[in-house]
Amino acid sequence: MKKLNKKMVLIVSVLVIQCLGIWTLWGNTALKVNEYKILSDKIPEAFSGFWIAQVADLHNAEFGEDNEMLIELLFQTDPDMIVITGDLIDSRQTDIEIALDFAGKAVQIAPVYYVTGNHEARIPEYAELKMGLTEAGVTVLENQKVQITKDGESITLMGIQDPSFRTDYLFGDAESVSRQAITSLQNKSDGFTVLLSHRPELFDLYVDTGVDLVFSGHAHGGQFRLPFVGGLVAPNQGFFPKYDAGQFVEKNTTMIVSRGVGDSIIPLRINNPPEIVVVELERK
């Protein structure tokens, strides 16, 4: 009987380990789509029902051959605009061809706008990446803004370069660099303003500068998501990050933080599947 019990314990243990392994693998490869709706009386009538898809932190990840799964899911969301919020490549295993192939396919779905992350700031190939993105039809925003026009009305899209291009990644004054970039672009006539910025930890700055909607990433959802707690760790926020994933609202500013689709120094997600974010604008 004791031998039988030991055998059963061993079998159950193996099955549990296998199930956990399958669940973890699935959780790292099963792409999700998460939708949000933004209501504002500043949104022009022409942009009510305007859909924005966000891809964050690709880090050279591939979902299917030539990222066909990611592209197909992005296509199914039927966006009016696609935004890429940094870390399209990974500085530890840089392959700009994966990034450019993805971008070239994404622009066939909708207009694509891109800002850098901290990983782009680390690679010597960034100039080559930027040129390739531009040639593919992607609009690269480096402390720049554009007017998005529809039916005679417009919203303002701003994109700031990751502060790592001008400061030390861990110890530089990212807030002052980003503040200068944002305020240099702002104008009272901008109307409803969307900001692309890689760094969610700067949310107080975005609120202070009065931006209406921010798309961000960088936190990877906190990497390991604990029930009833949230993310465990995120770059530039440390343990139990406040801005790990989801929607954050303060005053008149809303920030959407994507969990991202790829990984970097920690090549594992737990209870934190990769996601595409889709946001619908609606006039209130």
What are these regions (language model features)?
Residues 131, 135-138, 150-193, 203-204, ...:
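Binuclear metal-dependent hydrolase catalytic cores centered on His/Asp/Glu-rich metal-binding motifs
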Residues 80-81, 113, 138-139, 155, ...:
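Short, Asp-centered acidic motifs that coordinate Mg2+ and/or phosphate
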Residues 1-46:
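N-terminal membrane-anchoring alpha-helices
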Residues 59, 89, 119-120, 145-146, ...:
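Catalytic metal-binding/acid-base residues of hydrolase active sites
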